[in-house]
Amino acid sequence: MPEIKDKKSAERKSFFFRRSKSAPKNQEISITENDVLSDSSLYGKIDLDSAAQSEQQEKPIKHRPRKPVSKKDLPSKQKKEARQPKAEKKTEITEQPKKNGRGRPKKNAEPLFEEDIIVQKPAEKKKKSTKSEKPAKAPKTTKKQTDKTPLKIIPLGGLGEIGKNMTLIEYKNDIVIIDCGLAFPDDDMPGIDLVIPDFSYVIKNRDKVRGVVLTHGHEDHIGALSYLLKEVNVPVYSARLTIGLVEGKLKEAGILNESKLVVKKPGDVVKMGSISVEFIAVNHSIPDACGFAIFTPVGTLVHTGDFKIDYTPVDGQMIDLARFGELGRHGVLALMSDSTNAERPGMTPSERRVGESFEMLFKKAGDRRILVASFSSNVHRIQQIIDTAVRHGRKVVVSGRSMENVTAKASELGYLKYPENTIVDIDQMRGIPDENLVIITTGSQGEPMSALTRMARGEHRKISVTAHDYIIISATPIPGNEKLVGKVINDLMTLGAEVIYESSMGIHVSGHACREEIRTIFGLVKPKFFIPVHGEYKHLAKNRDLAVEMGVPFENIIVGENGHVIELTEDSVKSVTTVPCDAVMVDGIGIGDVGSIVLRDRKLLSEEGLMVVVATIDSKTGAVVAGPDVVSRGFVYVRESEELLAEAREVCRKALSAAEGANGNREWANLKQAVKDQLGSYLFSKTKRRPMILPIIQEI
């Protein structure tokens, strides 16, 4: 080969190649046709056959510059060749740097640049893995879909309402249930104890259900679980305190022994068929609250659960914002975020602010007995009440069944900490002076049977409110409970007690994120699609608007409804069909046996009263042989309405006679309807009221 004075120039004419960013300096680089083609976007395509032929002829290669092209612009044939390099098109080593004794370049070797290319015979190329990169602390995300099966998100409760939270995540033959809560009855549900979701779809697909994951231990998220597990017995996964509270409910329902409860902590991942769920720590008004990262074949979902961002939490456990950000960097297909406070600007104050208010109010109470009403599940609030009581030398009494249960379980699991003998039994408080006593009680929402409400009515068996009581209601009324709370406050003040209930006193903070906190989650997660959850429609709509402000396209957001099936793919989100989701009412031990007709009758009875008409007719002649008698309940006072009732009896007699058919035959339905129509018209003309009319006709 003729001597080349400028060796670098010759190499530059032979090959143009850009060193890979991932290759360390001073490392030998193998060049194959695949490598050259893959970098043709910057330097143009190189004909390796021509290069090899030129070397055999001992002539330098003349390179003709070409316009740079993108790899995606290459013909499909060239792309295929780039993926499958041919063995015969390998080049020989033309130059190597000096090496140390172990066969590696010396550390002080001159760095490789684009013009300093070392070409060597490539080693056998390893087959590239087709699996996607595994996120830290999470199961490997699935590769790109090929069958295009959509992921189904089916809310059975919690949308367009407060409470009854329950959502299904379904992919092919796998269903994972998120939460299973209850709701309290509305004013138009007389006699109803509580409301739970409709489990019809779950029961129909029981073979697909892989498990239940719970975000936290509030009633609107775990209250209906015992009813579900009686129908579909599947594993339940959640954090320690949540599982502890669930144990009590299942024990009361008599199904604890046959239930499978599994304790998980933040960072743990549960694989349920094709769906995996990772627990992520969040702040809320109860310890051990979690959000979820849900890994599916379609993509990753993030469900925040009920959350807030508290930088000074009472228990020192902060929300794992770093993990939310990490998920965002790996790519999140859809975000499902708490919408409860999406209307409120700014950030939710820290729970510690309430503790500071307690300190001020306890000092103001002086030598009076202190009563504090709060949500029984707000363990952080209870801890701060106890801490303040200890600092002021007061013993603590707990009143109210749910408060007693939660306090006992939280103490057992180590979530409530206090000096020994701080909490005393309610029967021991008689010997404790008022200035040394604090009573923590239920009833912050004015519930009719709660401890505080019974105290206000003078019906509590062991606690009587006096003018020497200082009462703090550490909660704000849930929408719809304002009248109940107001009545309790009025009754307590009538008894002479001083009641502190104003929100301006700092005695309550929310456990839900306001707009700036939701913005923070959006900034970290960066979802492609957004599905607002947990709230009335106005809350969901405000959260949708916030998502648009944060850059999520409007068409990528769907405000769902209970029972509407949301289908999610890599490229779309839409509502396609519905499943049964009627509210199931629980009345005593009856579940679902009270429907809209029964409620209508109850409402009618409560508003207009009842009139019962009893008559006996001869089966042969059709003549009325006894009655008709009229009985009134809740309609008019009998002693003052004798004339009205006498006329009502005559109207019924005429109606029965007029309805007699040919040959004395009578249709019972016609008889009853005739009595209802004619008596109803008469009573309305006299009273402008429409009582329920119940005809009872016997035949002899």
Describe the predicted segments one by one.
Residues 344-474, 478-503, 507-663, 672, ...:
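Hard-cation-handling environments
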Residues 1-29:
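N-terminal acidic, proline/glycine-rich, low-complexity intrinsically disordered segments
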Residues 116, 121-213, 218-431, 450-464, ...:
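His/Asp/Glu-rich metal-coordinating catalytic cores
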Residues 664-700:
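C-terminal tails and terminal domains of large nucleic-acid-associated
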Residues 235, 531, 694-697:
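Short glycine-rich phosphate-binding loop at a beta-alpha junction
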Residues 159, 183-194, 208, 501-504, ...:
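A glycine- and charged-residue-rich anion-binding loop/surface
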Residues 4, 15, 29-31, 36-37, ...:
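Hydrophobic/aromatic hotspots within intrinsically disordered, low-complexity regions
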Residues 63-69, 73-74, 81-88, 92-96, ...:
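Arg/Lys-rich, glycine/proline-spaced intrinsically disordered segments
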